[in-house]
Amino acid sequence: MLYKGDTLYLDWLEDGIAELVFDAPGSVNKLDTATVASLGEAIGVLEQQSDLKGLLLRSNKAAFIVGADITEFLSLFLVPEEQLSQWLHFANSVFNRLEDLPVPTIAAVNGYALGGGCECVLATDYRLATPDLRIGLPETKLGIMPGFGGSVRMPRMLGADSALEIIAAGKDVGADQALKIGLVDGVVKAEKLVEGAMAILRQAINGDLDWKAKRQPKLEPLKLSKIEAAMSFTIAKGMVAQTAGKHYPAPITAVKTIEAAARFGREEALNLENKSFVPLAHTNEARALVGIFLNDQYVKGKAKKLTKDVETPKQAAVLGAGIMGGGIAYQSAWKGVPVVMKDINDKSLTLGMTEAAKLLNKQLERGKIDGLKLAGVISTIHPTLDYAGFDRVDVVVEAVVENPKVKKAVLAETEQKVRPDTVLASNTSTIPISELANALERPENFCGMHFFNPVHRMPLVEIIRGEKSSDETIAKVVAWASKMGKTPIVVNDCPGFFVNRVLFPYFAGFSQLLRDGADFRKIDKVMEKQFGWPMGPAYLLDVVGIDTAHHAQAVMAAGFPQRMQKDYRDAIDALFNANRFGQKNGLGFWRYKEDSKGKPKKEEDVVVDDLLAKVSQPKRDFSEEEIIARMMIPMVNEVVRCLEEGIIATPAEADMALVYGLGFPPFHGGAFRWLDTLGSAKYLDMAQQYQHLGPLYEVPEGMRNKARHNEPYYPPVEPARPVGDLKTA
């Protein structure tokens, strides 16, 4: 053996050909700082081999390299700019030395080669892949850009347009697309990968393939005329501005860096990449987006641990068809769990089946499935007016009208029709689970399962643990939600659970602003354009349904009378009484008309101003800062209360529930990440300016204690000490 590190080794294969094998402990290879340093040492050994003729890179895992070790990022991003820049120079010197070896090199790439894994193989002369390949540079999704030469090598290999599409969007592509655009040189079956790579290497060694000519473009300026460059980069910048917007600086920075580096050779181009990467790594956006990635891993890991001893349900049932029931049935069937869909009338069943068929037809139109697959999935949804087949189901979710009496009656009747070990769940959005459990003989087999609309798009499912819900019940429902491709987060029971409990104080802040004379149009604009919500509160209420919000508001007020009870008529009351229910009947804060694609498009409606004038003070202007503060403080305070009361277990789960359930702007990272970025002391100062507005603006005691020492909610992160000889950079 020529070299052995903790995560890779180097050995001779045959006749002057060496293999460098990535083989980290555990299930996957990551390109962490230690592996980069180890790679440098291995290349140092290769540089001393006078009889070296060629090099094969491969992996001993099911995936080549899944990317950099993102768990290192937050601490790496705290390293001072100069030191981080030095380390990146060192890392790039390693990849340059790989690229500059005086022999042909090939990467045999199986499975994933993402981020640093992709950048590593870009430094080799040839790339041969297996059909399961996913290769790309997702860094911009984490608020950064490629830092190991990806923004330099990829455009010079693929051309500017293809590279910009991958880098700016943070995309990865499959084997066929990678071959088409020149990211890999061939695709072979997994069992032929090493054999095929060796054949290419021998051809290069024998002179049948000109490996030096293959390498040369990566070392030179980008081959684009001034007109071509102007077109490519202008179009790319326009697309990025439209899709990413001002809150996500990484994509536009990446495009501008590639543009600036286009006229330079490798060394100067890499220097420009370094100068762009380092400031991005120190942005709040990068910390927030990396935090979301890590929180997502944490939440999924927690679900996996929770379900390790239970069997995933093999047969499910939905009570109540319609749009929501049809959406749940589709999602379950689509992911391989057959479902019985029951309702008391044919019309609702037809609506539910139509919804499922519509979603499947969209998959067909996009080429994701063929007619055979569509027929196969739809055949696993069984509509019924009775309880036929319910003796075989493992889990039932009730999705009938949001009325406790109706829900209790339906659940109690269903309990008599299923096996004693069948789990029942309610898709209620606000009614306490422990209250509904009172109607059941086996409350330990019951919990909440709150889906978000539209079911097929929204990743979150809130799993609500009632007072008597057993651990096994929770685990089975979490397993089903995970099987459906959802992100389940377990919360404890209370009115509104977690997501709706924190949403309604936000709506209350909106109502108070309107009462004090604010214009809902400006509030929507500020909360969308400045804070970054996908919809402002008025638009969101129209989408949720003014009638739904009016009902839920009453439930929340009964549950938390001290904070959420109001003693005045507000905008929601005014619109509800005027039969303006939002998008569902075309009239809410806005008027809605269908566009050419049949989607509701909002328009101004002056009638609303007259309605709101009856429940508001005369119109006056509010600053953007005041609007954001008055909207966000009630929500954030309630989020903190939920953590303090144990409704939600951790800041990570709270933030993921907000991002996945409400669309909390990802570049803020969630309420707790936003709080930590702001600082608890600064937040307290801001909130105290508004505490005269009522109990929703009063900061919880636990947060006051944290603010005294400006303590964060997430565990403090220490700056990293990257492995690598900075002096050689």
From Swiss-Prot:
The record marks E119, E139 as: Important for catalytic activity. This is Fatty acid oxidation complex subunit alpha. HAMAP family: FadB (MF_01621). Its EC number is 4.2.1.17, 5.1.2.3, 5.3.3.8, 1.1.1.35. Involved in the aerobic and anaerobic degradation of long-chain fatty acids via beta-oxidation cycle. Catalyzes the formation of 3-oxoacyl-CoA from enoyl-CoA via L-3-hydroxyacyl-CoA. It can also use D-3-hydroxyacyl-CoA and cis-3-enoyl-CoA as substrate. Residues 707-729 are annotated as: Disordered. The keyword GTP-binding does not apply. GO terms for molecular function: 3-hydroxybutyryl-CoA epimerase activity; delta(3)-delta(2)-enoyl-CoA isomerase activity; enoyl-CoA hydratase activity; long-chain-3-hydroxyacyl-CoA dehydrogenase activity; NAD+ binding. NCBIfam families: FadB, PRK11730.1. Residues 1-189 are annotated as: Enoyl-CoA hydratase/isomerase. The gene is fadB.
